[in-house]
Swiss-Prot record:
Keyword Cell membrane: yes
Lineage: Bacteria, Pseudomonadati, Pseudomonadota, Gammaproteobacteria, Enterobacterales
Name by which UniProt lists this protein: Dipeptide transport system permease protein DppC
Domain of life per record: Bacteria
Entry function: Part of the ABC transporter DppABCDF involved in dipeptide transport. Responsible for the translocation of the substrate across the membrane.
Subunit structure: The complex is composed of two ATP-binding proteins (DppD and DppF), two transmembrane proteins (DppB and DppC) and a solute-binding protein (DppA). MppA can replace DppA as binding protein for heme and ALA transport.
Gene that encodes it: dppC
Transmembrane regions: 32-52, 102-122, 137-157, 207-227, 231-251, 266-286
Similarity remark: Belongs to the binding-protein-dependent transport system permease family. OppBC subfamily.
């Protein structure tokens, strides 16, 4: 009898760690795994672009203007994806453009997330007049088209990568404020918060130590989706001439510079467009997987 009991104890399943549980639910979404693999590849290219890119992104080959990709007639293996109207290698510019796009996306998400979380915690925890003021400002910002608002801000401060990133941060801010506030309103009346308040915990400890960790799941999902929105909006600003300025290798600017050659040299617009499309799609797929892995309702 004791032998049977011992065997049962030994064969009991080992509980998963939080990281193992997260990966268990995340990998069930095959699209999210594909998106993660693509993002890792793009991140690798962005980090090591200096070493793996064939040429400097600003280097011009005047004897190979609008050269087609290597597999087309007239193409060359020296320029695998062809060249643009001034002889710059398209593949090299795409690789360096990945670095800029990911950097801007990261900057926008981090800044908007930090400011949005702080404002959302204040609005949800204190309520009353403070909540009304913050949320009415947020409502006004959400009433304006996001890209139009970003264009106006960049036009005021001048077109540049930094100003475009700050404008996109301002545009993305309301989403994090509302999401954080909604999560705080759910948590603020729970027993553990009340007990902590009775024990003498101050407002700062309540907001950032007790409540904030329980609001992370929806914020992580929104940050993933916000990353793709930042890349897409940055490309749109670059396309309109309000983002990165030539000759900076940025995907939207690459499209804007060669738009007049779209019919005669399809590769100069197709490859930057595909880079934007696939990167945005990959982050959106990752966002779906993160939601599946972090939302308790979807785990059931």
């Amino acid at each position: 009898m004791s032998q049977v009991t011992e065997n049962k104890v030994i064969s009991a399943p080992v509980p998963m760690t939080p990281l193992q549980e997260f990966w268990h639910y995340f990998k069930r979404n095959k699209g999210a795994v594909v998106g993660l693999v693509y993002v890792v590849i793009v991140l690798f290219i962005a980090i090591f672009a200096n070493w793996i890119a064939p040429y400097n992104p600003a280097e011009q080959f005047r004897d190979a203007l609008l050269a087609p990709p290597a597999w087309q007639e007239g193409g060359s293996m020296a320029h695998l994806l062809g060249t643009d109207d001034v002889g710059r290698d398209v593949l090299s510019r795409l690789m360096y453009g990945a670095r800029l796009s990911l950097l801007v996306g990261c900057l926008v998400v981090v800044l908007s997330l930090i400011m949005g979380v702080i404002l959302g915690l204040i609005a949800g925890y204190f309520g009353g007049l403070v909540d009304n003021i913050i949320m009415r400002v947020v409502d006004i910002m959400l009433a304006l088209p996001s890209l139009l608002l970003a264009l106006v801000l960049v036009a005021i401060f001048g077109p540049s990568i930094g100003n475009a990133a700050l404008a996109l941060t301002f545009v993305a801010l309301p989403h994090y404020v509302r999401l954080t506030r909604a999560a705080v309103l759910v948590e603020v009346n729970r027993d553990y918060v009340t007990a902590s308040r009775v024990a003498g915990a101050g407002a700062m400890r309540q907001m950032f130590i007790n409540i904030f960790p329980n609001c992370l799941a929806p914020l992580i999902v929104q940050a993933s989706l916000g990353f793709s929105n930042a890349i897409l909006d940055m490309a749109a600003l670059g396309f309109l001439g309000m983002g990165a300025q030539p000759p900076t290798p940025e995907w939207g600017t690459m499209l804007s510079d060669v738009l007049q050659f779209a019919q005669s040299a399809w590769w100069v617009v197709t490859f930057p467009g595909l880079a934007i499309l696939l990167t945005v799609l990959a982050f959106n797929l990752m966002g779906d997987g993160l939601r599946d892995a972090l939302d308790p309702k979807l785990k059931q």
